[in-house]
Amino acid sequence: MNIKQIKAREVLDSRGNPTVEVDVILDDDTIGSAMVPSGASTGQREALELRDGGTRYLGKGVLKAVEFVNTEICNTLINFGIEDLGKIDQAMIDLDGTETKSRLGANAILAVSLAVAHANANRQHKPLYMSLNQGENYKLPVPMMNIINGGEHANNNVDIQEFMIIPAGAPSFKEALRYGAEVFHHLKAVLEAKNMNTTVGDEGGFAPDLSSNEDAIKVILEAIDNAGYKAGKDIFIGIDAASSEFYENGTYNLVSENKSLNSEEFVDYLANWVENYPIISIEDGMDENDWNGWNLLTKKIGDKVQLVGDDLYVTNSKFLKQGIEKNITNSILIKVNQIGTLTETFQVMKMATDAGYTSVMSHRSGETEDTTIADLAVATGCGQIKTGSLSRSDRLAKYNRLLRIEEELGAKAVYPGLDAFNHLN
């Protein structure tokens, strides 16, 4: 079955900024559609979105990217067979001709890549995860729920970008979601009792002003306890430090605590948390260019927790290969829009698996109602997903999609729990 038409349009994401939506239409009029997200704290090496500049939408319009899809990309891909996603993605990479997809825009290329996958699944009358993986059993992901937001995701004084709860002790995804929602509501009550702000950040988590970064962990533990769960048994904690956002000239500047730490001191700062709290995952613990710091961190706590590279690797095989060779981190965050095609996403995930690294499927802070990443988490069996807190429909859409997938699979659905985190001693 061949591609007959490709249509793109400008739509809005969860922050009210434009993004690209694409419909891929086949000869039999089957349609596949996808929308792409956008990040706030972005790695320096990410594939580049194409934005219009000027005054329209404060410079963030995507009409140029839309035009490239409707002309160059459409003209190139018409009559391509829908079954060979690798060939289609490579044709777009070649057409773009830049390393960072900056000519056509990673937002244009990715929207087409995802829409092609959806069109192929719809043609087969299969859900996307099943179209991408014809397996017997499917692994549902353990959710990493960002319930306190700081850093670039919130207007508060918390330096660390995300404090997450991880309901790895739940027996199923459905129950994990319930654990998370109950803790979220109890956290709101805890914050209200302390006269703290309960407005939410970009990813649906609360964004209170706190006297220290560590206080975020303490209020979460209080909420877990109040909800009737045991921290370290039912629910664990994950951190996304996004440390590149507060790293400058070799120093980690924790403004909320009036501290400036060198790499070794910041490693000790994080290691102290791991020692004292049920933390099982730390993402972007060190700056994306502080390879020495990453080496120190991996040696110190890499056998106790999952150390996830996000800004460090930007879902790119070239950078992951360097990390594997240097023996730093033990996990990679997967954001499809950092690399710009589904084919390259699968390639980097295979490289991670082959090296014994885990992969964590992830949303971006600027999201849409598109639920593709939920299917990708199940199709790849990566076992973990980051898709925000327990509020905002752009986040809940992914969780609700996973609920439907688990129900659809019945006995074929496996919830891995702590087994998804294979670096814990």
UniProtKB/Swiss-Prot annotation:
InterPro entries reported for this sequence: Enolase, Enolase-like_C_sf, Enolase-like_N, Enolase_C, Enolase_CS, Enolase_N
Superkingdom of origin: Bacteria
Pfam families listed in its UniProt record: Enolase_C, Enolase_N
Metal-binding found in the keyword field: yes
EC main group: lyase
GO biological process: glycolytic process
Isomerase recorded as keyword: no
Cofactor comment text: Binds a second Mg(2+) ion via substrate during catalysis.
Gene Ontology molecular functions: magnesium ion binding; phosphopyruvate hydratase activity
PROSITE patterns, alphabetized: ENOLASE
Catalytic reaction annotation: (2R)-2-phosphoglycerate = phosphoenolpyruvate + H2O
Record EC number: 4.2.1.11
Cofactor: Mg(2+)
Coiled-coil residue spans: none
Keywords: Cytoplasm, Glycolysis, Lyase, Magnesium, Metal-binding, Secreted
One GO cellular component term: extracellular region
Function in brief: Catalyzes the reversible conversion of 2-phosphoglycerate (2-PG) into phosphoenolpyruvate (PEP). It is essential for the degradation of carbohydrates via glycolysis.
Record text on subunit structure and interactions: Component of the RNA degradosome, a multiprotein complex involved in RNA processing and mRNA degradation.
Annotated family: Belongs to the enolase family.
Name of the protein: Enolase
Species whose genome carries this gene: Ruthia magnifica subsp. Calyptogena magnifica
